[in-house]
Design a protein with these regions (language model features):
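Structural preference for solvent-exposed beta-strand-turn elements
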Residues: 1-396
Length: 396
């Protein structure tokens, strides 16, 4: 095999694949990537850990068809260090690969292509959503997925499209993140109900982050397929049933306090410094016009801060794991900012265009029933997405 490719193109595609390549594995070939020719003007790059596979197609000048299989990490490190010029690859005898870029020359040890696993093909009729919407779903739910390997049915996200609505739900048993959006046009006829593993979600977010097009997806009995602008991610499906999350969605939280997201986030960060390291407990006392936060450690002391809030009702103390609060506030802040990121363009009249970012304060609605029932948080006045975060309180 022999081909030439732009350094920037190769660096980008190798960067996407690094997340799924195994660095420490009992199957040595999984530390490698496969590069194959596709006609005269394109190559295909594949990396896998057998659970998640990423396949990228890239423009290249193919002088001789064939394939090479070399260390994913070593190749990526070399390509990142090269100048922004064309990179030339040539396969030699005994699987060795010579690569040149400018005055730099390298020889890499390769392995036989036959050792590399076969990749499932994407045969099902694909459904599609805007990649920005899918990425939005992932960014604001993935943090609530459990890290406990034994709870495999919770180690991913439930993704549903039905009745003209797209929905994603995650939980670790202590908290739950829920987001949905109404679909329009041809999207309304789509239908899917599946579990997407956590690793696949995180890799999808990287691929979809700066993409302006659609993401096509489908499934077979064992795999999920996601395709975005020439890049295909394949994931093994999770077996088992996701819990009935609707049972924990609060139906009668008739008390609500509304506060500024940034003010609360800063207060939680400060007060949590005095929380007990074992329980991570922080206490919120909701009263007329304010929410008081306090945390204490028997060995180190205590911290207290008051955040203004729109609230009229009974004084109610509620305990939380401060990390659960902060993760929601961090993600809701990113979510709100990206929603508002459609900045207005203003002309000065002489052809000069300046961009004005009109970000306003983001408000959070904190909805509860009493000290013991689950609390629901959401972005107030958000009409585009229905985003809810439900947390079980701690005993205080």
């Amino acid at each position: 095999m022999e081909f030439t490719i732009k350094q920037s193109t190769l660096k980008d595609e190798l960067g996407f694949i690094q997340g799924v390549v195994e660095r420490k594995t009992t199957i040595p070939v999984l530390a490698n990537i496969l590069i194959e020719s596709l006609g005269d003007n394109e190559i295909r790059i594949v990396g896998t850990d057998l659970d998640v596979t990423i396949r990228c197609d890239a423009e290249a000048v193919v002088e001789k068809a064939g394939s090479i299989c070399v260390s994913a990490r070593k190749l990526f490190d070399i390509v990142r260090a090269l100048d922004a010029e064309d990179v030339h690859f040539k396969k030699d005898d005994n699987e060795w690969v010579t690569m040149k870029c400018g005055r730099a020359k390298f020889r890499l040890a390769g392995v036989n292509r036959e050792q590399f696993p076969e990749i499932p093909s994407f045969k099902s009729t694909p459904l599609s959503l805007p990649a920005a919407t899918f990425n939005y779903f992932i960014q604001n739910t993935a943090f609530a997925i459990t890290n406990e390997v034994s709870r495999f049915t919770l180690s991913g996200a439930k993704f549903v499209i039905a009745d003209g609505i797209a929905r994603m739900v995650t939980t670790d048993g202590h908290r739950l993140a829920f987001i949905e959006q109404k679909l329009s046009g041809d999207e309304k006829t789509s239908a899917i109900d599946t579990l997407i593993p956590r690793k696949a979600l995180l890799e999808l977010a990287k691929i979809a982050r700066d993409t302006g097009g659609d993401i096509a997806f489908g499934e077979d009995q064992k795999h999920l397929f996601f395709e975005i602008e020439g890049r295909l991610l394949i994931s093994r499906t999770l077996t088992g049933s996701f819990p009935n999350y609707e049972l924990v969605m609060p139906k009668d939280n008739d008390l609500a306090a509304v506060f500024d997201l940034e003010e609360m986030r800063a207060a939680v960060r400060r007060v949590s410094l005095m929380a007990d390291d074992r329980t991570r407990s922080i206490r919120l006392i909701v009263r007329d016009g304010e929410i008081e936060l306090n945390a204490q450690s028997s060995e180190e002391g205590e911290g207290r801060e008051v955040v203004p809030a729109e609230y009229t009702g009974p004084e109610t103390p509620i305990g939380f794991n401060w990390q659960y609060l902060l993760e929601f506030l961090n993600n809701a802040g990113s979510m709100a900012n990206s929603t508002k990121a459609e900045a207005e363009k203003e002309s000065d009249g002489d052809g000069t265009v300046r961009v004005r970012d009109g970000n306003a304060a983001t408000r959070i609605s904190f909805e509860f029933k009493d000290s013991n029932a689950q609390t629901q948080m959401r972005i107030a006045d958000n009409s585009e997405y229905d985003y809810k975060y439900i947390v079980m309180p701690l005993r205080i």
